Amino acid sequence: MKIAILSRDGTLYSCKRLREAAMRRGHLVEILDPLSCYMNINPAASSIHYKGRRLPHYDAVIPRIGSAITFYGTAALRQFELLGSYPLNESVAITRARDKLRSLQLLARQGIDLPITGIAHSPDDTSDLIKMVGGAPLVVKLVEGTQGIGVVLAETRQAAESVIDAFRGLNAHILVQEYIAEAKGCDIRCLVVGNEVVAAIERCAKAGDFRSNLHRGGVASIATITPRERDIAIKAAQTLGLDVAGVDILRAARGPLVMEVNASPGLEGIEKTTGVDIAGRMIQWIERHATPEFCLKIGG
């Protein structure tokens, strides 16, 4: 097969691993910067061009689209989809997952347990917002934040009001969540491929922090997950329409709670911790689904 990887930086670990895994299985691979793609949208002959040339047909496209380029990155991916390429995560699913409010609404509608969450845009009644999620301590987030950026733990009501007021000055959308103290600064990252959790790690925050993101200095170890955690991770990914997802779960006293679903999970931390060839599993999924029948169904 001919496979395109959409990424701004082909030297990143995840891109290199996906390229290696695909080539090892005999596929042709090209890494394309989605921001350098430009499109001819034409009912007679739509096409995608890249750095002065018209791109050929790709059997499959692997999107590694960062949150900062979601709009144009998913637009480029849609063009590949319209031309019959199989997407490992559809553009609509990526857009859905990147909208934190929309994704939480969909997960809640499906009965998936979440931390108690409130969301507002520059709330005038800060005290009621805090009360709505059960009071302090609580976590205040910028809706547009990633990798632990724009996330603050407010341990008292006064601190929570100060943080919310500060975020209000940014004219930003604010997400307020209950703080799960019993998780002790740890979460479980489940890597879902299709209908299976192929690997799971526990991520714990460094001393003095509560954010478990590996980019923020968190420490990872192999996790043994329960059947319920496995089922919740798979259901969360499927609810958002994702074939590949990183599902972050908090272990609360009342049971596992889904904190976030990542549409473009990094592979480095989880592969190096578990030793699982996740990139290979992703390529195998493509091999099973990027079939001639798929291209005919789409119209490619």
UniProtKB/Swiss-Prot annotation:
ATP binds at residues 141, 178-179, 187, 211-213. The keyword Secreted does not apply. InterPro entries: ATP-grasp (IPR011761), ATP-grasp_RimK-type (IPR013651), ATP_grasp_subdomain_1 (IPR013815), RimK (IPR023533), Rimk_N (IPR041107), Rp_bS6_RimK/Lys_biosynth_LsyX (IPR004666). Gene3D superfamilies: 3.40.50.20, ATP-grasp fold, A domain, ATP-grasp fold, B domain. Keywords: ATP-binding, Ligase, Magnesium, Manganese, Metal-binding, Nucleotide-binding, Protein biosynthesis. Its cofactor is Mg(2+); Mn(2+). Coiled coil: none annotated. GO terms for molecular function: ATP binding; metal ion binding; ribosomal S6-glutamic acid ligase activity. Binds 2 magnesium or manganese ions per subunit. GO terms for cellular component: cytoplasm. One of its GO terms (biological process) is translation. Mg(2+) 2 binds at residues 260, 262. Mn(2+) 1 binds at residues 248, 260. SUPFAM superfamilies: Glutathione synthetase ATP-binding domain-like (SSF56059). Mg(2+) 1 binds at residues 248, 260. Mn(2+) 2 binds at residues 260, 262. It is an enzyme of class 6 (ligase). Its EC number is 6.3.2.-. Residues 104-287 form the ATP-grasp domain. It comes from the Bacteria. Belongs to the RimK family. An L-glutamate ligase that catalyzes the ATP-dependent post-translational addition of glutamate residues to the C-terminus of ribosomal protein bS6 (RpsF). Is also able to catalyze the synthesis of poly-alpha-glutamate in vitro, via ATP hydrolysis from unprotected glutamate as substrate. The number of glutamate residues added to either RpsF or to poly-alpha-glutamate changes with pH. This is Ribosomal protein bS6--L-glutamate ligase.
